A protein has these predicted regions:
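N-terminal glycine-/serine-/threonine-rich phosphate-binding loop
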Residues: 1-32
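Generic structural signal for well-ordered alpha-helical scaffold segments
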Residues: 17-25, 48, 52, 88-92
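Phosphate-handling active-site elements
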Residues: 27, 53-59
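Glycine-rich beta-strand-to-loop/alpha-helix junction loops that act as flexible
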Residues: 34-39
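Short, glycine/charged-enriched secondary-structure capping and boundary segments
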Residues: 47-50, 78-80
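Ligand-binding beta-strand-loop-alpha-helix segment within the catalytic cores
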Residues: 57-107
Length: 110
């Protein structure tokens, strides 16, 4: 594994998005493990821009979220505290990913 140090957070976020986009472009049925949180917000924003510009196609990507809260009220998609809501808000609702191919830990499985 290479460790790449970038001069600024913005450059690191853009490079991360480019690495993800390159991986998807090389293998369209790419499987992504996705994280949430502030660190990823700008990475996802860059991926959205790349998708809108036709530089990456999410249509066949399969994603797995790494975490979810236990005991949230209501549906994960509508609860602003859930990671599903976070992913929809920051990425899934803005790119051409098939939401049937987006997966997270279900509350029934925890």
């Amino acid at each position: 594994m290479d460790i790449i140090v970038m001069p600024t957070a913005a450059e690191a976020e853009l490079l991360t998005a480019r690495i993800i986009a390159d991986a998807i472009n090389a293998k369209p049925f790419y499987k992504l493990g996705l994280a949430t949180g502030r660190t990823m917000e700008n990475v996802y924003a860059n991926l959205v821009k790349m998708n809108k510009a036709g530089k990456v196609d999410f249509s066949r990507v399969i994603s797995f979220n790494l975490d979810e809260y236990v005991g949230l009220k209501g549906t994960a998609e509508k609860n602003k505290d859930s990671y599903r809501y976070f992913m929809n808000y920051h990425l899934f609702n803005h790119v051409n990913i098939d939401k049937r191919n987006t997966h997270e830990i279900g509350r029934a499985h925890v």
